[in-house]
Curated annotation (Swiss-Prot):
Cofactor (UniProt): FAD
Protein's organism: Staphylococcus aureus (strain MRSA252)
Name of the protein in question: Aerobic glycerol-3-phosphate dehydrogenase
Enzyme class per UniProt: oxidoreductase
EC number: 1.1.5.3
Binding site for FAD: 21-49
Length: 557
Protein backbone atom coordinates (compact mmCIF):
# COMPACT_ATOMS: atom_id res chain seq x y z
CA UNK A 1 0.00 0.00 0.00
CA UNK A 2 2.87 2.36 -0.83
CA UNK A 3 0.54 4.82 -2.58
CA UNK A 4 -2.55 4.42 -0.43
CA UNK A 5 -4.95 7.26 0.33
CA UNK A 6 -4.94 5.96 3.91
CA UNK A 7 -1.20 6.76 4.19
CA UNK A 8 -1.53 10.50 3.49
CA UNK A 9 -0.93 11.54 7.11
CA UNK A 10 2.03 9.18 7.44
CA UNK A 11 3.55 10.53 4.20
CA UNK A 12 3.02 14.14 5.34
CA UNK A 13 4.76 13.40 8.64
CA UNK A 14 7.78 12.04 6.75
CA UNK A 15 7.81 14.98 4.34
CA UNK A 16 7.84 17.41 7.28
CA UNK A 17 10.58 15.67 9.21
CA UNK A 18 13.02 14.20 6.70
CA UNK A 19 15.56 15.71 4.32
CA UNK A 20 15.49 14.42 0.75
CA UNK A 21 18.17 14.08 -1.88
CA UNK A 22 15.59 15.16 -4.44
CA UNK A 23 12.19 16.83 -4.33
CA UNK A 24 10.14 16.79 -7.54
CA UNK A 25 7.39 19.32 -8.23
CA UNK A 26 4.83 17.85 -10.62
CA UNK A 27 2.97 14.54 -10.71
CA UNK A 28 2.50 13.97 -14.41
CA UNK A 29 4.36 11.35 -16.44
CA UNK A 30 7.60 13.37 -16.40
CA UNK A 31 7.63 13.74 -12.61
CA UNK A 32 6.63 10.10 -12.16
CA UNK A 33 9.47 8.96 -14.41
CA UNK A 34 11.99 11.07 -12.51
CA UNK A 35 10.74 9.71 -9.16
CA UNK A 36 11.13 6.13 -10.37
CA UNK A 37 14.58 6.63 -11.88
CA UNK A 38 15.94 8.49 -8.85
CA UNK A 39 14.49 6.13 -6.23
CA UNK A 40 15.71 3.09 -8.18
CA UNK A 41 19.24 4.56 -8.03
CA UNK A 42 18.99 4.82 -4.25
CA UNK A 43 18.15 8.49 -3.83
CA UNK A 44 15.78 9.61 -1.08
CA UNK A 45 12.96 11.11 -3.15
CA UNK A 46 9.81 13.14 -2.53
CA UNK A 47 7.22 14.25 -5.10
CA UNK A 48 4.36 16.73 -4.72
CA UNK A 49 1.48 17.32 -7.14
CA UNK A 50 -0.90 20.26 -6.67
CA UNK A 51 -3.88 18.47 -8.27
CA UNK A 52 -4.38 14.76 -8.79
CA UNK A 53 -1.67 12.75 -10.52
CA UNK A 54 -1.81 13.17 -14.33
CA UNK A 55 -4.59 15.75 -14.02
CA UNK A 56 -2.80 18.14 -16.37
CA UNK A 57 -1.34 17.11 -19.72
CA UNK A 58 -0.71 13.46 -18.79
CA UNK A 59 -4.39 12.43 -18.88
CA UNK A 60 -5.31 14.56 -21.88
CA UNK A 61 -3.10 13.28 -24.71
CA UNK A 62 -4.01 11.30 -27.85
CA UNK A 63 -3.21 8.24 -25.71
CA UNK A 64 -0.53 6.94 -28.06
CA UNK A 65 3.04 5.99 -27.24
CA UNK A 66 4.07 6.56 -30.81
CA UNK A 67 7.28 6.50 -32.77
CA UNK A 68 6.74 9.95 -34.22
CA UNK A 69 5.96 9.44 -37.90
CA UNK A 70 4.95 13.12 -38.06
CA UNK A 71 8.51 14.09 -37.08
CA UNK A 72 9.85 12.28 -40.13
CA UNK A 73 7.75 14.65 -42.22
CA UNK A 74 9.62 17.52 -40.51
CA UNK A 75 13.00 15.75 -41.00
CA UNK A 76 13.56 15.40 -37.24
CA UNK A 77 15.46 12.14 -37.76
CA UNK A 78 16.93 12.00 -34.25
CA UNK A 79 13.52 12.38 -32.64
CA UNK A 80 12.13 9.47 -34.70
CA UNK A 81 15.06 7.23 -33.77
CA UNK A 82 14.85 7.98 -30.05
CA UNK A 83 11.06 7.83 -29.70
CA UNK A 84 10.91 4.55 -31.62
CA UNK A 85 13.40 2.91 -29.29
CA UNK A 86 11.74 4.38 -26.19
CA UNK A 87 8.34 3.17 -27.38
CA UNK A 88 9.59 -0.42 -27.36
CA UNK A 89 10.92 -0.01 -23.81
CA UNK A 90 7.66 1.52 -22.53
CA UNK A 91 5.72 -1.40 -24.02
CA UNK A 92 8.01 -4.06 -22.62
CA UNK A 93 7.96 -2.55 -19.11
CA UNK A 94 4.17 -2.24 -18.97
CA UNK A 95 2.23 -4.29 -21.55
CA UNK A 96 -0.94 -3.91 -19.45
CA UNK A 97 -1.10 -0.18 -20.22
CA UNK A 98 0.39 -0.18 -23.73
CA UNK A 99 -0.94 -2.17 -26.71
CA UNK A 100 0.34 -2.46 -30.30
CA UNK A 101 -2.26 -1.19 -32.75
CA UNK A 102 -2.05 -1.36 -36.53
CA UNK A 103 -2.62 2.08 -38.03
CA UNK A 104 -4.00 2.72 -41.52
CA UNK A 105 -2.57 5.66 -43.46
CA UNK A 106 -4.89 6.29 -46.44
CA UNK A 107 -3.24 7.88 -49.47
CA UNK A 108 -5.39 10.21 -51.55
CA UNK A 109 -4.60 12.21 -54.64
CA UNK A 110 -3.13 15.54 -53.48
CA UNK A 111 -2.72 14.33 -49.87
CA UNK A 112 0.25 14.67 -47.51
CA UNK A 113 1.67 11.26 -48.41
CA UNK A 114 1.90 9.87 -51.94
CA UNK A 115 2.42 6.18 -52.59
CA UNK A 116 6.17 6.48 -53.23
CA UNK A 117 6.84 8.91 -50.37
CA UNK A 118 4.75 6.78 -47.99
CA UNK A 119 6.67 3.62 -48.85
CA UNK A 120 10.02 5.41 -48.47
CA UNK A 121 8.88 7.24 -45.31
CA UNK A 122 7.49 4.17 -43.54
CA UNK A 123 10.57 2.16 -44.56
CA UNK A 124 12.83 4.83 -43.03
CA UNK A 125 10.56 4.91 -39.98
CA UNK A 126 10.93 1.14 -39.54
CA UNK A 127 14.73 1.39 -39.67
CA UNK A 128 15.13 4.54 -37.57
CA UNK A 129 12.64 3.46 -34.90
CA UNK A 130 14.02 -0.09 -34.73
CA UNK A 131 10.61 -1.61 -35.50
CA UNK A 132 10.50 -5.38 -34.93
CA UNK A 133 10.06 -7.57 -38.02
CA UNK A 134 6.46 -8.58 -37.28
CA UNK A 135 5.41 -4.93 -37.06
CA UNK A 136 7.13 -3.51 -40.14
CA UNK A 137 5.10 -1.47 -42.60
CA UNK A 138 2.94 -2.87 -45.36
CA UNK A 139 1.82 -1.06 -48.48
CA UNK A 140 -1.82 -1.64 -49.44
CA UNK A 141 -3.72 -1.32 -52.70
CA UNK A 142 -6.92 0.71 -52.87
CA UNK A 143 -8.92 -2.52 -52.51
CA UNK A 144 -6.86 -3.68 -49.51
CA UNK A 145 -7.16 -0.24 -47.89
CA UNK A 146 -10.96 -0.33 -48.15
CA UNK A 147 -11.00 -3.89 -46.83
CA UNK A 148 -9.21 -2.64 -43.70
CA UNK A 149 -11.62 0.29 -43.26
CA UNK A 150 -14.61 0.51 -45.66
CA UNK A 151 -15.60 3.94 -44.28
CA UNK A 152 -12.52 5.67 -45.76
CA UNK A 153 -13.25 8.18 -48.54
CA UNK A 154 -13.11 6.36 -51.89
CA UNK A 155 -12.76 9.46 -54.08
CA UNK A 156 -9.12 9.95 -55.04
CA UNK A 157 -7.98 6.96 -52.93
CA UNK A 158 -4.76 5.45 -54.27
CA UNK A 159 -3.95 2.94 -51.55
CA UNK A 160 -2.63 3.00 -48.02
CA UNK A 161 0.25 2.47 -45.67
CA UNK A 162 -0.13 0.10 -42.73
CA UNK A 163 2.14 0.43 -39.71
CA UNK A 164 2.08 -0.11 -35.95
CA UNK A 165 1.50 2.52 -33.28
CA UNK A 166 1.13 1.78 -29.57
CA UNK A 167 -2.09 2.76 -27.83
CA UNK A 168 -1.88 3.57 -24.13
CA UNK A 169 -3.93 4.83 -21.22
CA UNK A 170 -1.81 7.88 -20.40
CA UNK A 171 -3.23 8.47 -16.91
CA UNK A 172 -2.85 4.81 -15.96
CA UNK A 173 0.69 4.72 -17.36
CA UNK A 174 1.47 7.67 -15.08
CA UNK A 175 -0.05 6.08 -11.98
CA UNK A 176 1.69 2.74 -12.60
CA UNK A 177 5.08 4.47 -12.89
CA UNK A 178 4.24 6.45 -9.74
CA UNK A 179 3.27 3.30 -7.82
CA UNK A 180 6.53 1.58 -8.70
CA UNK A 181 8.45 4.67 -7.55
CA UNK A 182 6.55 4.54 -4.24
CA UNK A 183 7.40 0.84 -3.92
CA UNK A 184 11.06 1.84 -4.35
CA UNK A 185 10.77 4.22 -1.40
CA UNK A 186 9.72 7.55 -2.93
CA UNK A 187 7.37 9.62 -0.73
CA UNK A 188 4.62 10.78 -3.08
CA UNK A 189 1.53 12.89 -2.41
CA UNK A 190 -1.14 14.63 -4.47
CA UNK A 191 -3.20 17.77 -3.73
CA UNK A 192 -0.06 19.42 -2.36
CA UNK A 193 1.02 22.68 -4.00
CA UNK A 194 4.49 24.19 -3.93
CA UNK A 195 4.21 27.76 -2.61
CA UNK A 196 7.79 29.02 -2.59
CA UNK A 197 11.39 27.85 -2.36
CA UNK A 198 13.69 28.05 0.64
CA UNK A 199 17.38 28.91 0.27
CA UNK A 200 20.60 28.35 2.19
CA UNK A 201 23.12 31.08 3.06
CA UNK A 202 24.64 30.77 -0.45
CA UNK A 203 21.25 31.40 -2.06
CA UNK A 204 20.98 27.79 -3.22
CA UNK A 205 17.54 26.16 -3.19
CA UNK A 206 17.35 23.81 -0.21
CA UNK A 207 13.66 23.11 0.09
CA UNK A 208 10.07 23.76 -0.92
CA UNK A 209 7.30 25.26 1.16
CA UNK A 210 4.03 23.49 0.31
CA UNK A 211 0.35 23.63 1.20
CA UNK A 212 -1.96 20.62 1.52
CA UNK A 213 -4.97 21.75 -0.53
CA UNK A 214 -7.27 19.29 1.25
CA UNK A 215 -6.52 20.54 4.78
CA UNK A 216 -4.79 23.93 4.21
CA UNK A 217 -1.78 22.74 6.26
CA UNK A 218 1.47 24.46 5.36
CA UNK A 219 4.90 22.86 5.78
CA UNK A 220 8.41 22.81 4.33
CA UNK A 221 10.15 19.86 2.66
CA UNK A 222 13.94 19.98 2.97
CA UNK A 223 15.91 18.94 -0.12
CA UNK A 224 19.43 18.86 -1.49
CA UNK A 225 18.11 19.29 -5.05
CA UNK A 226 14.74 20.37 -6.45
CA UNK A 227 13.42 19.53 -9.92
CA UNK A 228 10.56 21.50 -11.44
CA UNK A 229 8.60 19.08 -13.65
CA UNK A 230 5.30 20.94 -13.56
CA UNK A 231 4.45 20.68 -17.27
CA UNK A 232 2.32 23.68 -18.34
CA UNK A 233 3.05 25.26 -14.94
CA UNK A 234 6.88 25.19 -15.10
CA UNK A 235 7.03 28.94 -15.73
CA UNK A 236 4.68 29.58 -12.78
CA UNK A 237 6.92 27.49 -10.52
CA UNK A 238 10.10 29.17 -11.84
CA UNK A 239 8.62 32.63 -11.26
CA UNK A 240 9.17 32.05 -7.54
CA UNK A 241 12.93 31.61 -8.06
CA UNK A 242 15.27 34.60 -8.35
CA UNK A 243 17.57 32.89 -10.86
CA UNK A 244 15.34 31.96 -13.80
CA UNK A 245 16.63 32.22 -17.39
CA UNK A 246 14.95 33.94 -20.34
CA UNK A 247 13.50 30.78 -21.86
CA UNK A 248 9.76 30.24 -21.63
CA UNK A 249 6.96 27.93 -22.66
CA UNK A 250 4.48 28.37 -25.48
CA UNK A 251 1.32 26.42 -24.70
CA UNK A 252 -0.73 24.79 -27.43
CA UNK A 253 -4.05 23.01 -27.04
CA UNK A 254 -5.19 19.66 -28.40
CA UNK A 255 -8.85 18.63 -28.36
CA UNK A 256 -10.36 15.16 -28.84
CA UNK A 257 -13.96 14.06 -29.33
CA UNK A 258 -15.52 10.69 -28.48
CA UNK A 259 -18.38 9.22 -30.55
CA UNK A 260 -20.22 5.94 -29.98
CA UNK A 261 -19.51 3.30 -32.62
CA UNK A 262 -23.22 3.02 -33.34
CA UNK A 263 -22.85 6.48 -34.93
CA UNK A 264 -19.26 6.11 -36.18
CA UNK A 265 -18.62 2.35 -36.68
CA UNK A 266 -14.86 2.64 -37.03
CA UNK A 267 -13.18 -0.77 -37.07
CA UNK A 268 -9.60 0.27 -37.73
CA UNK A 269 -7.34 3.00 -36.33
CA UNK A 270 -6.67 5.60 -39.04
CA UNK A 271 -4.14 8.44 -39.35
CA UNK A 272 -5.41 10.89 -41.93
CA UNK A 273 -5.26 14.33 -43.54
CA UNK A 274 -7.73 17.05 -42.65
CA UNK A 275 -9.20 19.10 -45.46
CA UNK A 276 -8.84 22.56 -43.91
CA UNK A 277 -5.20 22.93 -42.93
CA UNK A 278 -3.38 19.74 -43.92
CA UNK A 279 -2.85 18.65 -40.30
CA UNK A 280 -2.92 14.93 -39.74
CA UNK A 281 -5.12 13.50 -37.02
CA UNK A 282 -6.02 10.11 -35.56
CA UNK A 283 -9.32 8.25 -35.39
CA UNK A 284 -9.02 5.31 -32.99
CA UNK A 285 -11.58 2.67 -31.89
CA UNK A 286 -11.63 1.98 -28.15
CA UNK A 287 -14.14 0.20 -25.90
CA UNK A 288 -17.11 0.57 -28.24
CA UNK A 289 -16.29 4.20 -29.02
CA UNK A 290 -14.21 6.04 -31.60
CA UNK A 291 -12.10 8.97 -30.48
CA UNK A 292 -10.70 11.52 -32.88
CA UNK A 293 -7.98 14.16 -32.47
CA UNK A 294 -6.18 16.27 -32.15
CA UNK A 295 -6.36 19.96 -32.87
CA UNK A 296 -3.28 22.15 -32.43
CA UNK A 297 -3.82 25.81 -31.55
CA UNK A 298 -2.03 28.34 -29.35
CA UNK A 299 -3.55 28.60 -25.87
CA UNK A 300 -3.34 31.22 -23.13
CA UNK A 301 -6.46 30.57 -21.08
CA UNK A 302 -7.11 28.61 -17.88
CA UNK A 303 -4.51 25.84 -17.57
CA UNK A 304 -6.17 23.61 -14.98
CA UNK A 305 -9.27 23.08 -17.13
CA UNK A 306 -8.56 23.86 -20.78
CA UNK A 307 -11.48 25.02 -22.87
CA UNK A 308 -13.04 23.02 -25.68
CA UNK A 309 -14.71 25.51 -28.00
CA UNK A 310 -17.38 25.03 -30.62
CA UNK A 311 -14.70 25.81 -33.19
CA UNK A 312 -12.65 22.84 -31.93
CA UNK A 313 -15.66 20.53 -32.15
CA UNK A 314 -16.56 21.76 -35.63
CA UNK A 315 -12.98 21.25 -36.84
CA UNK A 316 -12.99 17.59 -35.77
CA UNK A 317 -16.53 16.90 -37.02
CA UNK A 318 -15.58 18.36 -40.42
CA UNK A 319 -12.41 16.23 -40.45
CA UNK A 320 -14.39 13.05 -39.73
CA UNK A 321 -16.95 13.77 -42.43
CA UNK A 322 -14.22 14.63 -44.94
CA UNK A 323 -12.34 11.34 -44.53
CA UNK A 324 -15.38 9.16 -43.69
CA UNK A 325 -18.14 10.81 -45.77
CA UNK A 326 -20.74 8.06 -45.36
CA UNK A 327 -20.99 8.41 -41.56
CA UNK A 328 -22.25 12.01 -41.61
CA UNK A 329 -21.69 12.63 -37.88
CA UNK A 330 -23.03 15.79 -36.26
CA UNK A 331 -22.19 17.75 -33.14
CA UNK A 332 -25.03 15.98 -31.32
CA UNK A 333 -23.23 12.66 -31.83
CA UNK A 334 -20.31 13.75 -29.62
CA UNK A 335 -20.62 11.94 -26.28
CA UNK A 336 -17.62 13.50 -24.58
CA UNK A 337 -14.54 15.58 -25.24
CA UNK A 338 -11.24 16.34 -23.61
CA UNK A 339 -8.72 19.10 -24.11
CA UNK A 340 -5.05 18.98 -23.17
CA UNK A 341 -2.20 21.46 -23.14
CA UNK A 342 1.20 20.82 -24.68
CA UNK A 343 3.95 22.64 -22.75
CA UNK A 344 6.26 23.41 -25.69
CA UNK A 345 9.43 25.49 -25.61
CA UNK A 346 8.83 28.87 -27.24
CA UNK A 347 10.20 29.33 -30.76
CA UNK A 348 9.51 32.71 -32.32
CA UNK A 349 7.45 32.84 -35.50
CA UNK A 350 6.50 29.16 -35.59
CA UNK A 351 2.97 27.78 -35.99
CA UNK A 352 1.71 25.40 -33.26
CA UNK A 353 2.40 22.22 -35.26
CA UNK A 354 5.88 23.43 -36.24
CA UNK A 355 7.15 23.96 -32.69
CA UNK A 356 9.52 21.17 -31.68
CA UNK A 357 8.36 18.63 -29.08
CA UNK A 358 11.95 18.35 -27.80
CA UNK A 359 12.69 18.54 -24.08
CA UNK A 360 15.26 20.78 -22.41
CA UNK A 361 16.79 21.00 -18.94
CA UNK A 362 17.27 24.50 -17.52
CA UNK A 363 19.58 24.99 -14.52
CA UNK A 364 19.30 28.22 -12.55
CA UNK A 365 22.05 29.89 -10.51
CA UNK A 366 20.01 28.90 -7.46
CA UNK A 367 20.49 25.23 -8.34
CA UNK A 368 16.84 24.78 -9.32
CA UNK A 369 16.52 22.31 -12.19
CA UNK A 370 13.59 22.61 -14.60
CA UNK A 371 12.64 20.11 -17.28
CA UNK A 372 10.44 21.53 -20.03
CA UNK A 373 8.88 20.30 -23.26
CA UNK A 374 9.06 16.67 -24.28
CA UNK A 375 6.38 14.11 -24.96
CA UNK A 376 4.73 11.07 -23.39
CA UNK A 377 6.80 8.51 -25.30
CA UNK A 378 10.10 9.96 -24.12
CA UNK A 379 9.33 10.16 -20.41
CA UNK A 380 11.82 7.47 -19.34
CA UNK A 381 14.72 8.92 -21.31
CA UNK A 382 13.91 12.46 -20.12
CA UNK A 383 14.01 11.17 -16.54
CA UNK A 384 17.35 9.48 -17.16
CA UNK A 385 18.86 12.71 -18.49
CA UNK A 386 17.79 14.88 -15.57
CA UNK A 387 18.55 12.29 -12.87
CA UNK A 388 22.03 11.86 -14.39
CA UNK A 389 22.49 15.61 -13.84
CA UNK A 390 21.05 15.47 -10.30
CA UNK A 391 23.43 12.59 -9.52
CA UNK A 392 26.39 14.60 -10.84
CA UNK A 393 25.43 17.64 -8.71
CA UNK A 394 24.90 15.55 -5.57
CA UNK A 395 28.34 14.00 -6.01
CA UNK A 396 30.00 17.39 -6.55
CA UNK A 397 28.18 19.27 -3.78
CA UNK A 398 27.70 16.53 -1.15
CA UNK A 399 30.10 13.73 -2.08
CA UNK A 400 27.17 11.33 -2.58
CA UNK A 401 27.43 8.53 -5.13
CA UNK A 402 24.46 6.76 -6.71
CA UNK A 403 24.19 3.91 -9.18
CA UNK A 404 23.56 4.61 -12.89
CA UNK A 405 20.13 4.53 -14.53
CA UNK A 406 18.42 1.14 -14.33
CA UNK A 407 14.95 1.78 -15.75
CA UNK A 408 15.44 0.39 -19.26
CA UNK A 409 14.43 -3.09 -18.14
CA UNK A 410 12.47 -2.17 -15.01
CA UNK A 411 8.80 -3.19 -15.08
CA UNK A 412 6.37 -0.56 -13.87
CA UNK A 413 3.71 -1.48 -11.30
CA UNK A 414 1.50 -4.22 -12.76
CA UNK A 415 4.13 -5.03 -15.38
CA UNK A 416 5.54 -8.18 -13.76
CA UNK A 417 3.88 -10.45 -16.31
CA UNK A 418 6.87 -12.21 -17.85
CA UNK A 419 7.36 -9.70 -20.66
CA UNK A 420 5.16 -8.54 -23.51
CA UNK A 421 5.35 -11.89 -25.34
CA UNK A 422 3.85 -13.64 -22.33
CA UNK A 423 1.13 -11.07 -21.61
CA UNK A 424 -1.76 -12.78 -23.42
CA UNK A 425 -0.97 -16.08 -21.68
CA UNK A 426 -0.73 -14.22 -18.36
CA UNK A 427 -4.21 -12.73 -18.87
CA UNK A 428 -5.76 -16.11 -19.69
CA UNK A 429 -4.10 -17.66 -16.63
CA UNK A 430 -5.68 -14.95 -14.45
CA UNK A 431 -9.08 -15.52 -16.10
CA UNK A 432 -8.82 -19.16 -14.95
CA UNK A 433 -7.95 -18.00 -11.42
CA UNK A 434 -10.98 -15.69 -11.41
CA UNK A 435 -13.32 -18.56 -12.29
CA UNK A 436 -12.49 -20.05 -8.91
CA UNK A 437 -13.77 -16.83 -7.32
CA UNK A 438 -16.96 -16.91 -9.39
CA UNK A 439 -15.95 -13.78 -11.33
CA UNK A 440 -17.39 -13.42 -14.82
CA UNK A 441 -14.88 -14.33 -17.54
CA UNK A 442 -15.21 -11.06 -19.50
CA UNK A 443 -14.87 -8.98 -16.33
CA UNK A 444 -11.79 -10.96 -15.28
CA UNK A 445 -10.21 -10.54 -18.72
CA UNK A 446 -10.76 -6.77 -18.70
CA UNK A 447 -9.35 -6.44 -15.18
CA UNK A 448 -6.29 -8.60 -15.90
CA UNK A 449 -5.61 -6.71 -19.14
CA UNK A 450 -5.88 -3.37 -17.35
CA UNK A 451 -4.12 -4.06 -14.04
CA UNK A 452 -1.58 -6.69 -15.06
CA UNK A 453 0.22 -8.36 -12.17
CA UNK A 454 -1.76 -6.31 -9.63
CA UNK A 455 -5.04 -7.98 -10.63
CA UNK A 456 -5.02 -10.52 -7.77
CA UNK A 457 -5.58 -7.63 -5.37
CA UNK A 458 -8.76 -6.68 -7.27
CA UNK A 459 -9.93 -10.30 -7.26
CA UNK A 460 -9.46 -10.33 -3.47
CA UNK A 461 -11.55 -7.17 -3.10
CA UNK A 462 -14.32 -8.95 -5.01
CA UNK A 463 -14.54 -11.48 -2.16
CA UNK A 464 -15.20 -8.91 0.57
CA UNK A 465 -18.61 -8.72 2.19
CA UNK A 466 -18.78 -4.95 1.64
CA UNK A 467 -19.22 -5.50 -2.10
CA UNK A 468 -22.52 -7.28 -1.56
CA UNK A 469 -23.86 -4.23 0.29
CA UNK A 470 -22.94 -1.84 -2.54
CA UNK A 471 -25.11 -0.78 -5.46
CA UNK A 472 -22.27 -0.99 -7.97
CA UNK A 473 -21.44 -3.64 -10.57
CA UNK A 474 -18.55 -5.81 -9.37
CA UNK A 475 -16.07 -4.42 -11.91
CA UNK A 476 -16.63 -0.79 -10.90
CA UNK A 477 -16.64 -1.64 -7.19
CA UNK A 478 -13.30 -3.46 -7.18
CA UNK A 479 -11.64 -0.77 -9.32
CA UNK A 480 -12.93 1.97 -7.02
CA UNK A 481 -11.82 0.30 -3.78
CA UNK A 482 -8.44 -0.65 -5.26
CA UNK A 483 -7.86 2.93 -6.46
CA UNK A 484 -8.44 4.24 -2.93
CA UNK A 485 -6.31 1.56 -1.28
CA UNK A 486 -3.44 1.60 -3.79
CA UNK A 487 -3.62 4.68 -6.07
CA UNK A 488 -4.21 7.65 -3.75
CA UNK A 489 -7.68 8.46 -5.06
CA UNK A 490 -9.26 11.05 -2.80
CA UNK A 491 -11.93 12.78 -4.90
CA UNK A 492 -14.57 11.10 -7.08
CA UNK A 493 -13.16 12.68 -10.24
CA UNK A 494 -9.76 11.12 -9.52
CA UNK A 495 -11.45 7.79 -10.13
CA UNK A 496 -14.04 8.73 -12.75
CA UNK A 497 -11.70 10.70 -15.00
CA UNK A 498 -8.16 9.38 -14.48
CA UNK A 499 -8.01 5.93 -12.82
CA UNK A 500 -10.95 4.46 -14.75
CA UNK A 501 -11.27 6.76 -17.80
CA UNK A 502 -15.04 6.43 -17.62
CA UNK A 503 -15.68 10.17 -17.99
CA UNK A 504 -14.30 9.96 -21.53
CA UNK A 505 -15.07 6.44 -22.70
CA UNK A 506 -18.16 5.35 -20.77
CA UNK A 507 -19.96 8.46 -19.61
CA UNK A 508 -23.16 6.40 -19.23
CA UNK A 509 -21.55 4.54 -16.30
CA UNK A 510 -20.69 7.90 -14.74
CA UNK A 511 -24.29 9.09 -15.05
CA UNK A 512 -25.69 5.78 -13.77
CA UNK A 513 -23.34 5.16 -10.83
CA UNK A 514 -21.88 8.51 -9.71
CA UNK A 515 -24.11 8.75 -6.63
CA UNK A 516 -23.23 5.24 -5.44
CA UNK A 517 -19.53 5.91 -6.05
CA UNK A 518 -19.68 9.11 -3.98
CA UNK A 519 -21.54 7.25 -1.20
CA UNK A 520 -18.85 4.55 -1.00
CA UNK A 521 -16.03 7.11 -1.06
CA UNK A 522 -17.75 9.21 1.61
CA UNK A 523 -17.95 6.13 3.81
CA UNK A 524 -14.37 4.93 3.19
CA UNK A 525 -12.75 8.38 3.40
CA UNK A 526 -15.02 9.89 6.03
CA UNK A 527 -16.15 12.87 3.97
CA UNK A 528 -17.87 15.72 5.78
CA UNK A 529 -21.29 16.91 4.48
CA UNK A 530 -19.50 19.93 2.98
CA UNK A 531 -17.06 17.66 1.14
CA UNK A 532 -19.88 15.51 -0.22
CA UNK A 533 -21.58 18.63 -1.56
CA UNK A 534 -18.37 20.05 -3.06
CA UNK A 535 -17.23 16.80 -4.67
CA UNK A 536 -20.70 16.09 -6.06
CA UNK A 537 -20.62 19.52 -7.70
CA UNK A 538 -17.14 18.77 -9.09
CA UNK A 539 -18.46 15.59 -10.71
CA UNK A 540 -21.42 17.45 -12.24
CA UNK A 541 -19.04 20.11 -13.57
CA UNK A 542 -16.73 17.45 -15.07
CA UNK A 543 -19.72 15.83 -16.80
CA UNK A 544 -20.74 19.22 -18.18
CA UNK A 545 -17.20 19.91 -19.41
CA UNK A 546 -16.90 16.48 -21.02
CA UNK A 547 -20.24 16.77 -22.78
CA UNK A 548 -20.29 20.48 -23.54
CA UNK A 549 -16.74 21.78 -23.21
CA UNK A 550 -17.63 25.01 -24.98
CA UNK A 551 -19.79 26.09 -22.02
CA UNK A 552 -16.81 26.61 -19.74
CA UNK A 553 -16.21 30.17 -18.57
CA UNK A 554 -13.42 31.96 -20.43
CA UNK A 555 -11.43 33.07 -17.40
CA UNK A 556 -7.67 33.39 -17.13
CA UNK A 557 -5.53 31.99 -14.32
Amino acid sequence: MALSTFKREHIKKNLRNDEYDLVIIGGGITGAGIALDASERGMKVALVEMQDFAQGTSSRSTKLVHGGLRYLKQFQIGVVAETGKERAIVYENGPHVTTPEWMLLPMHKGGTFGKFSTSIGLGMYDRLAGVKKSERKKMLSKKETLAKEPLVKKEGLKGGGYYVEYRTDDARLTIEVMKRAAEKGAEIINYTKSEHFTYDKNQQVNGVNVIDKLTNENYTIKAKKVVNAAGPWVDDVRSGDYARNNKKLRLTKGVHVVIDQSKFPLGQAVYFDTEKDGRMIFAIPREGKAYVGTTDTFYDNIKSSPLTTQEDRDYLIDAINYMFPSVNVTDEDIESTWAGIRPLIYEEGKDPSEISRKDEIWEGKSGLLTIAGGKLTGYRHMAQDIVDLVSKRLKKDYGLTFSPCNTKGLAISGGDVGGSKNFDAFVEQKVDVAKGFGIDEDVARRLASKYGSNVDELFNIAQTSQYHDSKLPLEIYVELVYSIQQEMVYKPNDFLVRRSGKMYFNIKDVLDYKDSIIDIMADMLDYSPAQIEAYTEEVEQAIKEAQHGNNQPAVKE
